[in-house]
């Protein structure tokens, strides 16, 4: 026994087994009416259960074989399905005119029968069957990517067909809910996918508009999810007149081993014959041996070479450790192209003048192709960013009402007079107090559950992008934990100084982890420039690697003061802009009309004039002086160069403008900027300070 064959054991079936599955077909003298009722049941959202596959196959038999069972039984479609383990059971009822009449009268079908009794169908057109099948075929090209991409692709195709006057679909078919139902059916039904693909490839006569759409969709589905196969065959295993030659970049021994393994996987895939290009859609055997991760170096080199040749389909993401290899392959292939073109020009040019003209033309052609490729890739990146932003906004909107209800209910539990939380209902003589951090995370909600991911793509990187065939949100470059509202702090009434002294240590321990988690949501931002890494490779990088460290340790800030407003406004005439803001809508109030007052529940503040002295620059290295701690407000400069007025800017309902500007312009991440604005009202003062000093 060859010992090296141990590496291949378990990759090929030694005792092939096919699971048998029974499919029910329906045979009546009113087949068109039955088929229309099946379509109506699907469009109404009725779960046909075990009858779904049989109903879909009945539609296909009616459309392609005019319900001729003998012709269908002798067709290659039926033979392939039988070999795949499907058994056909025909229910005959010659007089049946409704789908309800041919449904099996068994106990587990009783919910379906009740639903079908309420179903009314007025359509009895045979063309509607082809219309429905052609509509289903629109979901095939992006079926392996996801529902969002598949629905968007289908809508684009619908628009094209309507503009060309080929087919017009009913408006209620184009709703998101209905299209998600069709996507789910197509994703789970092997029979429907197989019949559409088989007929789309082999139907050569009798085409109508519906068959034309199906053939077009099937053509776009070829090699869907098999980009590595397409790129390797086109650019790595180069076919020449003398045979197949390897690309020069993969002639090293280690990559050659991957090429040999890949050839073996391709030979196994080729056994599926004409269905091999659709192996990912049909989930055929051997498809798992063609993953990018099994051939990391070959995949990275192939994608880099394909991008150099102007292929925008090669925009999938590779492993982070192989990203540099991909870029190196891209650069090397560009140089090789120029060298080959130069050699060809030298061979075909008759004189120096012609050689110069040809060289200039090829140089311009290469630059134009490269710029156009980058432009298309940039559009895909922007599309991905917009798509991710829409998804995050939908998540926030869905959770917003529940979280606001939770905040209101908890505020009534924590404080019998919750109206005192907001500015508009505070008593005239009661000071505004900043509450200690309160952990009001939703019950049973873990950090993983409460955090989702948002997409960020580096605009300076021509490779970090989404491919038309592989643009899944799961594979995109994600930044973890950017949209959740983990902290829903509900302010408590001000405690006496004795209570604060007793619980100060406990509160500090509870708030430390929350502050660190809060900042972790904004610290994993990519560097502004790839060349300038000094800001991210020295002390600041170490502090990020060690969550226990504090980037604000050089700036010792005083505790938050208490302020009383000199100019009170009528709370009825001027309500707070945001009643859910635990700090009140201080909004446009500036430091000139604020006066620190003494309170037993906070550190005493020095008496000052009504007009505060000018804010002055506070360097990050200033020492822990009592004088410095008591001079409020102060202009603070963080290690990252952000400047804000402490504590006034942290008491506003919106984050300091310098933080928003940094996220949008410096980090080029407007998504995180919006999330910071959304999370700011829910943060405690310590959390706000931590984010401001470290961002």
Curated annotation (Swiss-Prot):
A molecular function GO annotation: RNA binding
Pfam families from the UniProt entry: Ebola_NP
Record's compositionally biased regions (Polar residues): 495-505, 537-552
GO biological process: viral budding via host ESCRT complex; viral RNA genome packaging
Effect of residue 77 to I: In strain: pp3/guinea pig lethal, pp4/guinea pig nonlethal and Isolate Enterlein
Record PTM text: Phosphorylated.
Effect of substituting residue 611 to K: In strain: pp4/guinea pig nonlethal
Keywords, sorted A to Z: Capsid protein, Coiled coil, Helical capsid protein, Host cytoplasm, Host-virus interaction, Phosphoprotein, Ribonucleoprotein, RNA-binding, Viral budding, Viral budding via the host ESCRT complexes, Viral nucleoprotein, Viral release from host cell, Virion
Coiled-coil zones: 316-341, 372-399
InterPro entries listed in its UniProt record: Ebola_NP
Effect annotated for changing residue 514 to P: In strain: pp3/guinea pig lethal, pp4/guinea pig nonlethal and Isolate Enterlein
Family that this chain belongs to: Belongs to the filoviruses nucleoprotein family.
Domain-level remarks: This protein can be divided into a hydrophobic N-terminal half, and a hydrophilic and highly acidic C-terminal half. The coiled coil region is critical for homooligomerization, for the interaction with VP35 and for NP function in RNA synthesis.
Assembly description: Homooligomer. Homomultimerizes to form the nucleocapsid. Binds to viral genomic RNA. Interacts with VP35 and VP30 to form the nucleocapsid. Also interacts with VP24 and VP40.
Protein's job: Encapsidates the genome, protecting it from nucleases. The encapsidated genomic RNA is termed the nucleocapsid and serves as template for transcription and replication. During replication, encapsidation by NP is coupled to RNA synthesis and all replicative products are resistant to nucleases.
Protein name (database record): Nucleoprotein
């Amino acid at each position: 026994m060859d010992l090296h064959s141990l590496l291949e054991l378990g990759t090929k079936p030694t005792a092939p087994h096919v699971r048998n599955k029974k499919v029910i077909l329906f045979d009546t003298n009113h087949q068109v009416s039955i088929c229309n009722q099946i379509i109506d049941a699907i469009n109404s959202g009725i779960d046909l259960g075990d009858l779904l596959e049989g109903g879909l196959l009945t539609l296909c038999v009616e459309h392609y074989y005019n319900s001729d069972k003998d012709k269908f039984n002798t067709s290659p479609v039926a033979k392939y399905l039988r070999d795949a383990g499907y058994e056909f059971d025909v229910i005959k009822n010659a007089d049946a005119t409704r789908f309800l009449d041919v449904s099996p009268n068994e106990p587990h079908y009783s919910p379906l029968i009740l639903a079908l009794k309420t179903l009314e169908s007025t359509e009895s057109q045979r063309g509607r069957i082809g219309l429905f099948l052609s509509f289903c075929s629109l979901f095939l090209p992006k079926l392996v990517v996801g529902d969002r991409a598949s629905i968007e692709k289908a809508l684009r195709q619908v628009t094209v067909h309507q503009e060309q006057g080929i087919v017009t679909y009913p408006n209620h078919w184009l709703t998101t809910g209905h299209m998600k139902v069709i996507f789910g059916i197509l994703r789970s039904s092997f029979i429907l996918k197989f019949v559409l693909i088989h007929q789309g490839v082999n139907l050569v006569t009798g085409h109508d508009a519906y068959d034309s759409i199906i053939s077009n969709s099937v053509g776009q589905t070829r090699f869907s999810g098999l980009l590595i196969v397409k790129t390797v065959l086109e650019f790595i295993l180069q076919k020449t007149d003398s045979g197949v030659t390897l690309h020069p970049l993969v002639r090293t021994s280690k990559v050659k081993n991957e090429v040999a393994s890949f050839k073996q996987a391709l030979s196994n895939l080729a056994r599926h014959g004409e269905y091999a290009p659709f192996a990912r859609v049909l989930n055929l055997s051997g498809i798992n041996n063609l993953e990018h991760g099994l051939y990391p170096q070959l995949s990275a080199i192939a994608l880099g070479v394909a991008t150099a040749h102007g292929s925008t389909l090669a925009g999938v993401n590779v492993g982070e450790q192989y990203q540099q290899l991909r870029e190196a392959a891209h650069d090397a292939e560009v140089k090789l192209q120029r060298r080959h073109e130069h050699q060809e020009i030298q061979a075909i040019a008759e004189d120096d003048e012609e050689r110069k003209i040809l060289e200039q033309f090829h140089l311009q052609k290469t630059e134009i192709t490269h710029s156009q490729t980058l432009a298309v890739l940039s559009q895909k990146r922007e599309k991905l960013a917009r798509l991710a932003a829409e998804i995050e906004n939908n998540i926030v909107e869905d959770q917003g009402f529940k979280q606001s209800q939770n905040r209101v209910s908890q505020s009534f539990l924590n404080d019998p007079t919750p109206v005192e939380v907001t500015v508009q209902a505070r008593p005239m003589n009661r000071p505004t107090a900043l509450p200690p951090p309160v952990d009001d995370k939703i019950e049973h909600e873990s950090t993983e559950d409460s955090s989702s991911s948002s997409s960020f793509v580096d605009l300076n990187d021509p490779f970090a992008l989404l491919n038309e065939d592989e643009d899944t949100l799961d594979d995109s470059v994600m930044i973890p934990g950017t949209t959740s509202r983990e902290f829903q702090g509900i302010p408590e009434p001000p405690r006496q100084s004795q209570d604060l002294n007793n619980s100060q240590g406990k509160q500090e321990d509870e708030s430390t982890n929350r502050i660190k988690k809060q900042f972790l949501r904004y610290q994993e931002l990519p560097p502004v420039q790839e060349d300038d890494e000094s800001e991210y490779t020295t002390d600041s990088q170490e502090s990020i690697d060690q969550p226990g460290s504090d980037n604000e340790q050089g700036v010792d800030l005083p505790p938050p003061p208490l302020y009383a407003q000199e100019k009170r406004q009528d709370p009825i005439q001027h309500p707070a802009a945001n009643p859910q803001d635990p700090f009140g809508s201080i909004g446009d109030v500036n430091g000139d009309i604020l006066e620190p007052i003494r309170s037993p529940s906070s550190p005493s503040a020095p008496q000052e004039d009504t007009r505060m002295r000018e804010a002055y620059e506070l360097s990050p290295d200033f020492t822990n002086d009592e004088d410095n701690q008591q001079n409020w407000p102060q202009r603070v400069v963080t290690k990252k160069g952000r400047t804000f007025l402490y504590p006034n800017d942290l008491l506003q309902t919106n984050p300091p403008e310098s933080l928003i500007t940094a996220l949008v312009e410096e980090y080029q991440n407007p998504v995180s900027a919006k999330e910071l604005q959304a999370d700011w009202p829910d943060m405690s003062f310590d959390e706000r300070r931590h984010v401001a000093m470290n961002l």
